[in-house]
Each structure stands twice: as C-alpha cells, then as structure tokens.
C-alpha cells in the first residue's frame, strides 16, 4: 500500500524540496500540499510550484477538506503553525514528521502529549550525516569532554529566524547528557564585554547568519596543544528532505510514540 504524504508550508524553500523528495521516492506519493490561510499560492499545482511539472495536487489552506487524501503530514514550518497541525493530526489519526525548530518548553510538551495518540518523528535535523555526528559527539565527549573547552559554532542563511539553530542545541544536548551536565545551566549563548575567564564546564555557542548558507555546524573539543573538530556542512536542503521522507516511511507501521532520527537510523546499535 502506498503511503500518502502531505506537505505543510509547501511554498517555502523547504516545502518545495519536500515535494521533490516525495515525488522521487519509492513507496510514497504526494497526497496533499498546504499553505497558510489566504496564501496567494492556494490553488497552484504543487509539482509546478516545486519545479517538477504538473502533479495534479493543488495547494490548499484547509486541512479538513483534504484529510482523506493523506496518511502522514511532514511539517517544517513555524512553531505556532505546527502546533495547530498537531491538534488536527491527533483528531484525525494522522502520523507526523516534524522538522520545525524553535519550540518553547510548552510546545515540546504538546508534541510529547500528542505522541500518546499518534506516531511522530520529531528531530532538529533530518540529515543522515548530522545524526551520525550526534553519535560521534557523544564518543568525543566521553573521551575528552572533562579535560577540554567545548564550543559549538553554527552558520545558516540570513532568513533563519531562530538562534542558535535547533541542530546546534541538539549537539549541545548530546554533549551535556554524556557529561552529566544540564545545558540550561552550562550553556553560554552570548559573550560581550568583560566576561571573565572561561569556565571549563561551559558549553559555548556561536551563531552566524549570512547569505544563502544552507547549514554548517562545527564542534570544537579544545585542549592545550590540540583541538578535535567535528563538522558537518550541508550543500542542499535535499539532504533534509530525503531524510524526512525516509522517516515518514519508517513511521508507516507505527501506531503511536515519539521518535527521532536515532530511532529511524538505528544509531543506538552502532
């Protein structure tokens, strides 16, 4: 049976990549595509919007009218929109892949609560390479973390609205958890003026916003006389889109639960 996928935010940069990824993947098909209420893109063919030709799927701004056309919703939009989509999916038993970042604690609690009813993959980054990096960071932190300074440096395009990136925060969380630290108290997100000497147990974050950078992350484990850097650079959003579709296919036989790309890629068994 073919898995029917809907895309939220179909007209955005990521939305168009997701349409392309669904169209090219085996075992899935594009069932619906959505934009915000009143968008000028409503009624446009999703395939033409994504530059791959006519698909016969018109962009809609009404999930209710399209609910019989999809089994799973992929959402890379904004937290407020995603939370509305979550409520709809819970009410209509639709699975979700969520790549939206910037949720506050209440938003994360809402996602966890929804996963009691439906199956959700929620990840800060759907790149296979980035999720492998998460595991490498845990290994490095275990060996070097208590003896070095740790800094997370990330760069994204000028249009990104949240900082640090969700991926950078996830990197920090993986490191902090490995070291038994709380990122809320050990994370340093701003340095300005006379800050005093750096504390050894800090996990620092630096953010760059410039031009059309798709996404770059680097973590330094810096000791006296040597430094280990673990980096990932994305050159195309298709890596995230393909990962999201892979996650959706993995969810097909799951009734409920909250998962991430570690589960999808079975990284805990490495």
From Swiss-Prot:
NADP(+) binds at residue 36. GO terms for cellular component: cytosol. One of its GO terms (biological process) is lysine biosynthetic process via diaminopimelate. The keyword Amino-acid biosynthesis applies. Its EC number is 1.17.1.8. Gene3D superfamilies: Dihydrodipicolinate Reductase, domain 2, NAD(P)-binding Rossmann-like Domain. NAD(+) binds at residues 9-14, 35, 99-101, 123-126. GO terms for molecular function: 4-hydroxy-tetrahydrodipicolinate reductase; NAD binding; NADP binding; oxidoreductase activity, acting on CH or CH2 groups, NAD or NADP as acceptor. (S)-2,3,4,5-tetrahydrodipicolinate binds at residues 157, 166-167. Its main location: cytoplasm. Pathway: Amino-acid biosynthesis; L-lysine biosynthesis via DAP pathway; (S)-tetrahydrodipicolinate from L-aspartate: step 4/4. The active site is at residues 156, 160. It is an enzyme of class 1 (oxidoreductase). The keyword Coiled coil does not apply. It is found in: Cytoplasm. It catalyses: (S)-2,3,4,5-tetrahydrodipicolinate + NAD(+) + H2O = (2S,4S)-4-hydroxy-2,3,4,5-tetrahydrodipicolinate + NADH + H(+); (S)-2,3,4,5-tetrahydrodipicolinate + NADP(+) + H2O = (2S,4S)-4-hydroxy-2,3,4,5-tetrahydrodipicolinate + NADPH + H(+). Keywords: Amino-acid biosynthesis, Cytoplasm, Diaminopimelate biosynthesis, Lysine biosynthesis, NAD, NADP, Oxidoreductase. It holds the Pfam family DapB_N. Catalyzes the conversion of 4-hydroxy-tetrahydrodipicolinate (HTPA) to tetrahydrodipicolinate. NCBIfam families: dapB (TIGR00036). Belongs to the DapB family. This is 4-hydroxy-tetrahydrodipicolinate reductase.
């Amino acid at each position: 049976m073919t898995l029917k996928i809907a895309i939220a935010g179909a007209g955005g940069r990521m939305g168009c990549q997701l349409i392309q990824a669904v169209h090219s993947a085996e075992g899935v098909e594009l069932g619906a595509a959505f934009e915000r209420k009143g968008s000028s893109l409503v009624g446009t063919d999703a395939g033409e919007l994504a530059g791959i030709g006519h698909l016969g799927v018109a962009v809609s701004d009404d999930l209710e009218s399209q609910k019989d056309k999809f089994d799973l919703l992929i959402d890379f939009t904004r937290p407020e929109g995603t939370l509305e989509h979550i409520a709809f999916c819970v009410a209509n038993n639709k699975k979700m892949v969520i790549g939206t970042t910037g949720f506050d604690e209440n938003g994360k609690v809402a996602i966890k609560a929804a996963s009691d009813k439906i199956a959700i993959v929620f990840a800060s980054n759907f790149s296979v390479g980035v999720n492998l990096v998460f595991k490498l960071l845990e290994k490095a932190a275990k060996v070097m973390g208590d003896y070095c300074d740790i800094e997370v440096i990330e760069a994204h395009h000028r249009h990104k609205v949240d900082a640090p990136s969700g991926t950078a925060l996830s990197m920090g969380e993986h490191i902090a958890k490995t070291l038994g630290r709380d990122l809320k108290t050990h994370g340093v997100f701003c340095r300005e003026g006379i800050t005093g000497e750096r504390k050894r147990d800090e996990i620092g974050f630096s953010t760059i916003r410039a031009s059309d950078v798709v996404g770059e992350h680097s973590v330094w484990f810096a000791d006296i006389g040597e430094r280990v850097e673990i980096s990932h650079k994305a050159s195309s959003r298709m890596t995230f889109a393909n990962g999201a579709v892979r996650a959706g296919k993995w969810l097909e036989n799951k009734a409920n639960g909250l998962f991430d790309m570690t589960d999808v890629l079975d990284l805990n068994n490495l």
